[in-house]
Amino acid sequence: VSDVRNVIIIGSGPAGYTAALYTARASLKPLVFEGAVTAGGALMNTTEVENFPGFQEGIMGPELMDNMRGQAERFGAELVPDDVVAVDLTGEIKTVTDTAGTVHRAKAVIVTTGSQHRKLGLPNEDALSGRGVSWCATCDGFFFKDQDIAVIGGGDTAMEEATFLSRFAKSVTIVHRRDTLRASKAMQERAFADPKIKFVWDSEVAAVKGDPKLEGLTLRNLKTGETSELPVTGLFIAIGHDPRTELFKGQLELDDEGYLKVEAPSTRTNLTGVFGAGDVVDHTYRQAITAAGTGCSAALDAERFLAALADGEATEPEQTQTANV
């Protein structure tokens, strides 16, 4: 069992790294569990990030995360590419257990575990993962050169995946359960203008077929109930995300969808000394810049909490104006 630290950050990505940067600059010496597989968060799986302010020409997702990570490290954050397997956040001193079984203790914890890709929940889906079924076009798109591919979803991610895949694929079919897209106007127009992309509306995937590799999909029209076959060798699923909050069930208050509840506008959770930021909290905006913003807020909230503790106040201080920018 280690000494008691000021703050432990569980998770990385823009929220975790920004929280690490701010707490490190406040000389709190944060320990950051970046995640073994998920270090860097969802942006590690994106290509060009064109909407993060300050990068006129855009920046690659992994490069942006690498920059943020290095910046946090430069100011003294301790970054560990490891997962957390258990937590006890209920006491005054919080405990966090890593995969090696080492128990780390801290006065404050910031949760930035992010979210993961939602699955269709069909038999065969997991079995064919990596054999035609994927959740990441930028990771796997290259393997589908000159093949027929389906993309499931109607939001920005689905359009982004489809337009990216059209560079490699012979054809891309977007299957959406409604007859209009949720994606932004710019993303829609890009997809509609692409000669390789076609749409199947009002439909869902009823079955994922193939053994040992993906051979096709059975689609069900939600208005008529009719089924049809779509022969594809690639399936990219882009139907949203589920927050990574499994670890915190029974301790931290979650909403109906499993997202961490915080006392807005602060990042405080229902447990004293525990704060939440990034996609694990946010199912509205889900942008790199908003995640970074809440990571900053969580760090400032934790900083104030620790200052109040040092002054002998047992509870969290009231909201105060801050001059930090």
Task: Name each model-derived stretch.
Residues 121, 126-143, 239-286, 290, ...:
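FAD-site-proximal beta/loop scaffold in flavoenzymes
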Residues 1-10, 26, 31-32, 38, ...:
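FAD-binding core/adjacent interface of flavoenzyme oxidoreductases
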